[in-house]
Amino acid sequence: MIDSDGFRANVGIIICNRYGQVMWARRFGQHSWQFPQGGVDDGESAEEAMYRELYEEVGLRPEHVTILTSTRSWLRYRLPKRLVRQDSKPVCIGQKQKWFLLQLKSQDSAINLSSSGHPEFDDWRWVSYWYPVRQVVSFKRDVYRKVMKEFAVTALSFQTQEIPRKRVRQRTTG
């Protein structure tokens, strides 16, 4: 669904774990990392699109997550001119996104990047909460900064455990 301004309706998904970390995924066959996201189909609500994309991109079902919050409004970013497909009608100049913050209730092993048969991602990892703002492709950075700021209090308040630290071996002399 592309609106009259040329923005495609899209949902963004931030999945957090009990350590206050967020899931960060690498685009299939590329070196770029991002949060899961995807388009909203005609007749589909943003929440329905989020659950569909959640399964298609990372193999998680509603029973694996809890919705903690969503953005108050749609956030927009423009695509760089080199990525705008001028031959498509209507022309899509960017995305308008409704973002969802989810808490993972299941084990990490429930994450399956190949669940749809057409993987969007080929790797994933847990990263510190603010890490994606610095690492995402530049044209998405402002939206990432806004959504992470809006979700920060909620996301970090659901941190229930400290990240396990690697034990440092102590040498004994003698």
UniProtKB/Swiss-Prot annotation:
Give one GO molecular function term. Answer: mRNA 5'-diphosphatase activity
Keyword Cell division attached: no
- Does Hydrolase appear among the keywords? yes
GO biological process: what's one of them? mRNA catabolic process
For the protein in the UniProt heading, the enzyme class is hydrolase
Q: Name one Pfam family in it.
A: NUDIX
Nudix hydrolase domain span: 6-149
Its Gene Ontology cellular component terms are: cytoplasm
CC cofactor: a divalent metal cation
Task: Give the EC number.
Answer: 3.6.1.-
**Motif Nudix box: which ranges?**
38-59
TM helices/strands, residue ranges: none
**InterPro entries to which the protein is assigned, alphabetical:** Nudix_hydrolase, NUDIX_hydrolase-like_dom_sf, NUDIX_hydrolase_CS, NUDIX_hydrolase_dom, RppH
Q: What does this protein do?
A: Accelerates the degradation of transcripts by removing pyrophosphate from the 5'-end of triphosphorylated RNA, leading to a more labile monophosphorylated state that can stimulate subsequent ribonuclease cleavage.
Instruction: Please state which protein family the record places this protein in.
Output: Belongs to the Nudix hydrolase family. RppH subfamily.
Q: How is this protein named in the record?
A: RNA pyrophosphohydrolase
Biological source species = Shewanella sp. (strain ANA-3)
